[in-house]
Structures are given as C-alpha cells and as structure tokens.
C-alpha cells in the first residue's frame, strides 16, 4: 500500500513573523564603495555584522547611470533610512574607491541626521604591486 504524501506547507512548519529580530543599534559603521561603474553602501554594527545595504543597481539605475553621483546619493539614502528606523544615532564612515559617487554619498549621509564620529578614506593604494591593465585605445 502506498504511503500518504506529506503536505508541504502545513501549519506547523510555517514560521510566523520576521526571521530577523529588530535590534536597537545606537552606533554603526557606514561603508561606501564607489567604483566608476557602481556605488555600494553597506551599514554594519561596530562588530561588522551587516544591518542594511544598498547599491545604485538595486535602486533601479542601470548601465552607465549607476556610476553617477545622483545614483550614489539615492543608494546612500536608501541604506541609511533603514538603520535610522532601528535607532542609529552615531556612525563612522569608511569610503573606498575612486568613483564619482564618493562625495554625493557622503553628502547624503551628512543630511540624514546621523552624527559622524569620523570619515576615513580606506582606498587601497599599491606600494608598486601588480602591473596595472593596459590603457584603452578608443
């Protein structure tokens, strides 16, 4: 005789509510990675656990528009809006990369109302390491 097929999605297997618990984070670190093609903003707590993140691509910008300052400003605003709701008041800012969105993202962070402890440029600089790629001929 055939065994009865267990029902998938029965009530006892379904989790109610959100899996993430709403933490109160008074202090955090905002990482801005600005490349020429995109800007990624990640907000972590002081231990480095990611609380919120956003990028110009997830904000709806596609192609070359992802590298623009306006796209970086929108991405920073989206990432910070989520953590302000969780109670973040103070933050440190780490900016990495040579992209156009560096200053625009920092301006959006300053306007959000979060007190900034410091702003640090953590762009990796080689001490004459790897050979750079050849120059483009257009």
From Swiss-Prot:
Keyword annotations from UniProtKB, A to Z: Chloroplast, Plastid, Ribonucleoprotein, Ribosomal protein, RNA-binding, rRNA-binding
- Superkingdom of the source species: Eukaryota
TM regions (residue ranges): none
Q: Where are the residues of the annotated region Disordered?
A: 1-25
Reply yes or no: does the keyword Phosphoprotein apply: no
Please provide one cellular component term from the Gene Ontology annotations of this protein. Answer: ribosome
One Gene Ontology term from the biological process aspect of the record: translation
Q: What is its main location?
A: plastid
Bias (Basic residues) ranges: 9-25
Q: List the GO molecular function terms.
A: rRNA binding; structural constituent of ribosome
Where does the record place it?
A: Plastid, Chloroplast
**NCBIfam families to which the protein is assigned, alphabetical:** PRK05309.1, uS11_bact
What is the annotated quaternary arrangement, including any partners? Part of the 30S ribosomal subunit.
The family annotation for this protein states: Belongs to the universal ribosomal protein uS11 family.
What is the name of the protein in this document?
A: Small ribosomal subunit protein uS11c
Q: Which gene encodes it?
A: rps11
């Amino acid at each position: 005789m055939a065994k009865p097929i267990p029902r998938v999605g029965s009530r006892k297997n379904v989790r109610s509510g959100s899996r993430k618990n709403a933490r109160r984070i008074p202090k955090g670190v905002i990482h801005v990675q600005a490349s020429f093609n995109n800007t990624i903003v990640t907000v972590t707590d002081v231990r480095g656990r990611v609380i919120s993140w956003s990028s110009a691509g997830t904000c709806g910008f596609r192609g070359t528009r992802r590298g623009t300052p306006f796209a970086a400003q929108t991405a920073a605003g989206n990432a910070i809006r989520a953590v302000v709701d969780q109670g973040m008041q103070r933050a440190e800012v780490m900016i990495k990369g040579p992209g156009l969105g560096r200053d625009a993202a920092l301006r959006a962070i300053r306007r959000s109302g979060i007190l900034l402890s410091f702003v640090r440029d953590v762009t990796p600089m080689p001490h004459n390491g790897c050979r750079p790629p050849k120059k483009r001929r257009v």
